[in-house]
Amino acid sequence: MAGAKEIRSKIASVQNTQKITKAMEMVAASKMRKSQDRMAASRPYADTMRKVIGHLATGNLEYKHPYLEERDVKRVGYLVVSTDRGLCGGLNINLFKKLLADMKAWSDKGVQCDIAMIGSKGVSFFNSVGGNIVAQVTGMGDNPSLSDLIGPVKVMLQAYDEGRLDKLYVVSNKFINTMSQAPTITQLLPLPASEDDELKHKSWDYLYEPDPKALLDTLLRRYVESQVYQGVVENLASEQAARMVAMKAATDNGGSLIKELQLVYNKARQASITQELTEIVSGAAAV
């Protein structure tokens, strides 16, 4: 059994770690609320854009934009949203597992995959396991802006425009609630038809001013950018929620460990006192 002094040192070490994890839990809770506000503010715009694009995908358009046309799939692209920091439980690895499974399904069909990575954890992971990373952006912090994402989005859209990609997806964690975040893979291009059953039975027609091509070029790019940005802010809220839960679990585990060490410490002290009493009694008997 370890000595009482050594056990006291371990207890002090765990208590110090517990203070750190408790502080990180409180910081994550504060950041999560701010991230949720940002997510809620951007969601109406993203949802409205998705609805309008759903109308376009099911409408009778006078100009058929390339983003609306299905192609033979030879190469797919993924805009992957990961975190820049760790200590957020299985948030990243669960997302990567889902992505790898989807990539394998395409690979089994002879389709190649390109990745545009957002977040340093994703870059590190796919550099180690192997993956064709064609663009990346890291270090966006806790207040990302659309301008931070233009680089990877532009690279993937240019590849799609030039016919080097036939499908484009955004991969991120969807914030459900504080305790639950779901990894999702959402198709961006070609534009998926609306999933609203009511819209499927309607015929949509639009009048464009001044020019359908110029308008759709701008609108559809804004749509892709809005969906990627929404994925980033949802992933950020998911990250802070997962980190808060992970740090709370670490703090609680620290408390349990301290109780166990305190019990061991008490037993060690009891054994030490018993040994001292035995030595005193033995010495007295010898005299």
Swiss-Prot record:
The keyword Cell membrane applies. It comes from the Bacteria. One of its GO terms (biological process) is proton motive force-driven plasma membrane ATP synthesis. GO terms for cellular component: plasma membrane; proton-transporting ATP synthase complex. It is a peripheral membrane protein. One of its GO terms (molecular function) is proton-transporting ATP synthase activity, rotational mechanism. It is found in: Cell inner membrane. The keyword Magnesium does not apply. Keywords: ATP synthesis, Cell inner membrane, Cell membrane, CF(1), Hydrogen ion transport, Ion transport, Membrane, Transport. Its main location: membrane. F-type ATPases have 2 components, CF(1) - the catalytic core - and CF(0) - the membrane proton channel. CF(1) has five subunits: alpha(3), beta(3), gamma(1), delta(1), epsilon(1). CF(0) has three main subunits: a, b and c. Belongs to the ATPase gamma chain family. Produces ATP from ADP in the presence of a proton gradient across the membrane. The gamma chain is believed to be important in regulating ATPase activity and the flow of protons through the CF(0) complex. This is ATP synthase gamma chain.
